[in-house]
Amino acid sequence: LSEKMDIAALSYMEQLGTRSDPSRDPSQRTVATAYLGLVPAQVKTTIPAYAQWVPVDNLPQMAYDHADIISEGVDRLRAKLSYTNIAFALAPPDFTMAELTHLYQAALGHEVSPTNLQRVLSRRGQLAPTGQRKAPGTKGGRPARRFRFTKQTLQVTDPFAILRPS
């Protein structure tokens, strides 16, 4: 993927699994090892004309078992967002809670309360304020505080947690 999509800045990668079902490719026996790779939101990529980013809930028709592999990756990410600090791999170095909430909502596929998200992540020791604030917008109001993740490596933060729609 990094060669085809000009993505050199993977912030996290793990093996999803190896598939070797004899019927996965009707023309020959193939073995495929799939990986979950995360790219930080702020990374800009050059996408070739033959490719495009698509929402995971609106995938095009795919060959073989590729849709199943993607579904497995999405499920793995969603689960890990509940009990680890894996969001560090999606977020920029510093962010507002609104920006982080947007990342969680996009990954989880449902609404997330910014207040509850901040409370949970702070209680787990995942967030630290940077002391900076976002530049004020045109609508006025208090500028949003900026945060960063305390760790940039994967850690289990709550082995019994689950984030789900209320």
For each predicted feature, which ranges?
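Long, intrinsically disordered, low-complexity Ser/Thr/Pro-rich regulatory/activation regions
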Residues: P129-S166
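NUDIX/MutT-family hydrolases
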Residues: A34-G37, K44-L81, L90-A98, H102-L103, ...
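Active-site segment of metal-dependent pyrophosphate-handling enzymes
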Residues: S2-T45, A79-A87, R124-R133
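A short beta-turn/loop motif at secondary-structure boundaries
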Residues: S23, P92-D94, G137-K139
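Short helix-coil junctions and helix-kink-helix linkers
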Residues: H102-E111
